[in-house]
Amino acid sequence: TDMSAQNAAAADTVAAVTETITEVVAAPAEEASAAPDTVGELALGLNTVWMLLAAMLVFFMQPGFALVEAGFTRVKNTANILMKNFVDFMFGSLLYWFIGFGLMFGAGGFIGMPHFCDLSFINNGLPTEGFLIFQTVFCATAATIVSGAMAERTKFSMYIVYTIFISVLIYPISGHWTWGGGWLMNGEEGSFMMSHFGTTFHDFAGSTVVHSVGGWIALVGAAILGPRIGKYGKDGKSKAIPGDSLTISALGEFI
């Protein structure tokens, strides 16, 4: 009986030790498997924070544009300039969310497939809502660049038409070519870019999609509209048109 009790106690001890060893060995393995998930979540969080911070900085360009344009134009046109910039961002954001975002990042070579008010089609490893905000402020920037070039010589109603056009078509299509999987970034063998140049087109910070697109449209608009009324006299000589406030314009330039 004593031997049986001793054997039972020994067996219980061995079982307890074995269970403890198993737990000790399994714990690091579980921690190791959980570590990549933790690192991935941390990287996603940092990327999201940085993306939203960059979006905020790009959005801050909007008051900068407004101050520059209001400072360099005459005081009688200040309200018109400020309202254009406000409506530019308001209408542009809504239209880009409803239509432009799908055209920019939908499947397709020349233009993306439309996804009206639908964000479920995109999965790039980032929160879709945050990525939408990031792209929206870029679209608004491309549209607002044109406002200064055509200041004091564009009807308010026609400027709204232009805002709709660039937010729905021009920026989404050019953005699709370079950022949305379009033909300029197609790296497949036999594609246009690879067969002609051996590489794809890269635009890391919007120098082409945002600034060149807005700049070229501004140039075309200024060339079509011509100089401001009163800029040249009957003799063809240029006349100075003093702005409202150099202080305001300087502040806008710094922003």
Locate predicted features:
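Hydrophobic alpha-helical transmembrane bundles of multi-pass membrane proteins
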Residues: M3-I255
